[in-house]
Curated annotation (Swiss-Prot):
Family: Belongs to the peptidase M20 family.
Molecular function via GO: hydrolase activity
Record-linked Pfam families: M20_dimer (PF07687), Peptidase_M20 (PF01546)
Annotated Gene3D superfamilies: 3.30.70.360, Zn peptidases
Keyword terms, alphabetized: Hydrolase
SUPFAM superfamilies xref list: Bacterial exopeptidase dimerisation domain, Zn-dependent exopeptidases
InterPro entries: Amidohydrolase, Bact_exopeptidase_dim_dom, Peptidase_M20, Peptidase_M20_dimer
EC numbers: 3.-.-.-
The protein, known as: Uncharacterized hydrolase SERP0968
Highest taxon of source: Bacteria
Amino acid sequence: MNELEFVTLHRRHLHQYPELSLHEFETTSYITSFLEDLGVPYDRPLKTGVIAYLEGNSHHTIAFRADIDALPIYEENDIDFKSKNDHVMHACGHDGHTTALMLFVKRCKALYDKSELPHNVVFIFQPAEETGGGANRLIKAGAFDKYPIEAVFGFHVNPFEKEGKIVIRDEEITASATEYRFFLKGLSSHVADKEQGHSCGEGLQHVLSQIGQIQQFHLNGLKRNIIHMGHFEAGEAINTVPSHGYLEGTIRTYDTEDLAIVKHQMHKIAESVQLLFNVECEVKFEEGYPPTMNHPQLRQAVENAIEGANLEVVEKKLPFLFGEDFSFYGQQLAPSYFVFVGTQNKEKGFVTGLHTAHLNFDEKILIDVVNYYEHLLRNYKEV
């Protein structure tokens, strides 16, 4: 089996059997069976996910990560390897990430068998990137305590960049992701006696209006921030004053000071609802993923590896606005660098974005990724 056949076989199997965050049991079994067949040792510090390891010829230890979970999306692709798990799909390309790392393990094992593996390598098949913060869970579980990891590398497919190109950026490359929720509690009454009630409808309308003002009047207009309102509801019946209200959304930013400003203003909005409408209002935050920070001292190694793999470097001027839990590795484990690998091919129809029901790509790009990884490994120098 050549490498194109390898990545096609494994990626399409994984694509047919996607599993949601923290439920990647069959995916984990598939990976461990592959590792056992190769004779590569591994650990399972969590119920799902796998950490594999090969000892090389130096004291340096480098980690490479792939996320393995899928999304609750019904696939609409008309392909013979369409998802067989109802309303679950690899709509973010993690089937490709996993397959690329499997091929890289295979290459590294071949080098190891010939005593030619240049450095120690940790292979992270990580669960729960989409929800659950699998990277942070692994770190807190002590999954890496026995490995003196010096650098962590990872990638994500990018359907907005053409095949053969890899997008890089020093410092922030993805945003932080913080969820917020407003809870309103008023007093119901019949609409004929609405003055007797305390309406969460008006209170919620005020919240919606004021959230929209935060970005315009309290944040630097030259920075890219998102305050998104994703879902809201109020009321119980057509002829009653709403006694309850709810709103939830997400905040995306690269700057911790901006995030603090947004939170402060949201607390003030909640207080104003109580004063203006006599409605109890509370806002709660759920911290998501911090910004993914690329270590500048790894940049030259990354650029050299991309060029060594005959791929094109594309410099990203502004960070992406989505969150990515790869950020925890750079924050808590070791210097890290995360890149975005182009998968767009208009002739083949590979143009739809991430988290869509039609995401697809040519498996050959996964071999490009492994070539890039191998150049990183062979030419790694201590940061």
